Each structure stands twice: as C-alpha cells, then as structure tokens.
C-alpha cells in the first residue's frame, strides 16, 4: 500500500517572482525552510497568514507538516494549523502567532517555518459501542507524570 518512490522529486511552482524556493540548511535537516513572499507586521497576541507564493504537489501517501523554526520559537512566534493535504495545490500559507510581548516584523524573504514531509495512512473508521480496555484507560493530561 505504501509503494512510494522516495527518489522522486517533489514538484513545486513559484506563483510570483516574490516566491523563494524551499531550502534545507544542512544535508540532514528534517524540514525545508519556507520563506515569506511579503512584509507583515504581527502585534503581540495576534496572528497573521503569511503567504509563500509557493504551491506544490505532495508525494503520494504523504502530507506536509508545517513546523515552527526554533529561532522564531525563542522569540515567542508559533505556528497555527500546519497541515498540507496530499491533494492541496494552492498557495502555501503559514499562520504565525505572536505570543511575545513585542510587535514582530516579517520581511520578504524571511524564513518563517519548515515543511516536513510525513507519511500518512487513510484508515477506514468503524463505530463501535466500546473500546478494548488498557492499563491507562481514560487517564489523560498529565496522568503519566513528569519523570
């Protein structure tokens, strides 16, 4: 079922001349950096959809996960949303959330997030009356402790 050629290139389109090709900063970087195609200002506590002006076709049985860049996370900038479905072909946008105390400026050409390709499984769902029991059961948030 997961017959995919990992050597096949991922095709992308620069929708405008403002777009910058996704890049990896090292040979073993997990993600490809995505770049802002425009200037934006994000006040503290606000969010903004940042356009990359890039569209691409995801590899079969993969989706694109938009992940934060660690350097931006240190400045209080996080990512909202973050899934590019296998069949999406539009302009890739990144929702940046400013959790910091200062206004955050995004300039054209800034690296704003990283795109990580991940395999996906499309299971059939089956509604049942109950689930198999486990030792953990319904114990959720924090139930396994910190250590």
Swiss-Prot record:
Q: Which GO terms describe its biological process?
A: dUMP biosynthetic process; dUTP catabolic process
Question: Carries keyword Hydrolase?
Answer: yes
Residues binding dUTP are 68-70, 82-85, 88, 93, 95, 111
Please, which domain of life does this record's source organism belong to? Viruses
* EC number, UniProt record: 3.6.1.23
Q: Which cofactor does it need?
A: Mg(2+)
Q: Pfam families attached here?
A: dUTPase
Q: Which reaction does it catalyse?
A: dUTP + H2O = dUMP + diphosphate + H(+)
Induction / repression: Expressed in the early phase of the viral replicative cycle.
From the UniProt record, which GO molecular function terms apply? dUTP diphosphatase activity; magnesium ion binding
UniProt keyword list? Early protein, Hydrolase, Magnesium, Metal-binding, Nucleotide metabolism
Query: What InterPro entries does the annotation carry?
Result: dUTPase (IPR008181), dUTPase-like (IPR029054), dUTPase-like_sf (IPR036157), dUTPase_trimeric (IPR033704)
> Which of this chain's residues are annotated to bind Mg(2+)?
24
Q: Which cysteines are joined by disulfide bonds?
A: none
Top-level class of the enzyme under EC nomenclature: hydrolase
What this protein is reported to do is described as: This enzyme is involved in nucleotide metabolism: it produces dUMP, the immediate precursor of thymidine nucleotides and it decreases the intracellular concentration of dUTP so that uracil cannot be incorporated into DNA.
Report the family membership: Belongs to the dUTPase family.
| Protein name in the entry | Deoxyuridine 5'-triphosphate nucleotidohydrolase
Q: Please name the taxonomic classification of the source.
A: Viruses, Varidnaviria, Bamfordvirae, Nucleocytoviricota, Pokkesviricetes
């Amino acid at each position: 079922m997961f017959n995919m050629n990992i050597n096949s290139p991922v095709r992308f389109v620069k929708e405008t001349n403002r777009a910058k090709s996704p890049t990896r900063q090292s040979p073993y970087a997990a993600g490809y950096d995505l770049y802002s195609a425009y200037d934006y200002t994000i006040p503290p506590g606000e969010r903004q959809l940042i356009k990359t002006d890039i569209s691409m076709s995801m590899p079969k049985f993969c989706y694109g996960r938009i992940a934060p860049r660690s350097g931006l996370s240190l400045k209080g900038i996080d990512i909202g949303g973050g899934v590019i479905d296998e069949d999406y072909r539009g302009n890739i946008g990144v929702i940046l959330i400013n959790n910091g105390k200062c206004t955050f400026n995004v300039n054209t050409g800034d690296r704003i997030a990283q795109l990580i390709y991940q395999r996906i499984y499309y299971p059939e769902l089956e509604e049942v009356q109950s689930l198999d029991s486990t030792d953990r059961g319904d114990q959720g948030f924090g139930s396994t402790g910190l250590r």
